[in-house]
């Protein structure tokens, strides 16, 4: 787990301010959802947190250390998966160990036994152990995103960032993938920040919420604080009739059968498939 301190963060691109005076602190183990319309600054904020984008002014600290570039202890899940479609789910997951081994060793699967086990455990966590040898390009969008989650887990991060991880998925697959992200965060004790624009999903899986508008943080609170008035402030006058509240939004569920074409394998992430051919 990691704690994050963001202080007076500002990022501009020419005359355009993507982030303005953003400050907050995330505690160890929190599952935080960043809400906001497209262009609100969510992606820029996450890229500053993982060191992919350098802020114009202000600072980001993880466990008290300034973020000055990409860090091995920060895993990232992208909207467009960023997986290699010609490779199998297993090989894609194994590539998460690149921060500990060379590209050549990873491509030829010359990884040590523990790294191979890490990849299999990660695929098990997201319900894809039985599909380890399936080529990623033949998988559904939801399954591909789950491969991306497994790759991030193999990186062995303390902090997990997810940038609109379900934006391109249908509602059922989106709920499934968010369930796996929440389950992975719980099992691996990860501090997690996920940007979303689906309020229902945010309320279902989020513990804390940061609302952004025009590059600024306009809300920071918990589920009971995320009222319809707050949602209107973040998104404008949207239809709130279908937004779930109360008990309907409190199910932190990782489904055992996925709507995106995959099913959970038997056993948990600590299961060691000692006879698995990937370990030879």
From Swiss-Prot:
Cell membrane listed as a keyword: yes
Record's GO cellular component terms: plasma membrane
Positions bound to ATP: 36-43
Enzyme class: translocase
Record keywords: ATP-binding, Cell membrane, Membrane, Nucleotide-binding, Phosphonate transport, Translocase, Transport
Enzyme Commission number(s) of this protein: 7.3.2.2
Annotated membrane topology: Peripheral membrane protein
Reaction equation(s) it catalyzes: phosphonate(out) + ATP + H2O = phosphonate(in) + ADP + phosphate + H(+)
Family matches, as PROSITE patterns: ABC_TRANSPORTER_1, ABC_TRANSPORTER_2, PHNC
Region Disordered, annotated ranges: 246-280
Family matches, as InterPro entries: AAA+_ATPase, ABC_transporter-like_ATP-bd, ABC_transporter-like_CS, ABC_transpr_PhnC, MetN_ABC_transporter-like, P-loop_NTPase, Sigma_54_int_dom_ATP-bd_1
Key word 4Fe-4S present: no
UniProt-annotated location(s): Cell membrane
GO molecular function: ABC-type phosphonate transporter activity; ATP binding; ATP hydrolysis activity
Domain ABC transporter: 4-239
Name of a matching Pfam family: ABC_tran
SMART domains: AAA
Quaternary organization: The complex is composed of two ATP-binding proteins (PhnC), two transmembrane proteins (PhnE) and a solute-binding protein (PhnD).
Similarity comment: Belongs to the ABC transporter superfamily. Phosphonates importer (TC 3.A.1.9.1) family.
Entry function: Part of the ABC transporter complex PhnCDE involved in phosphonates import. Responsible for energy coupling to the transport system.
Official protein name in the record: Phosphonates import ATP-binding protein PhnC
Organism: Halobacterium salinarum (strain ATCC 700922 / JCM 11081 / NRC-1) (Halobacterium halobium)
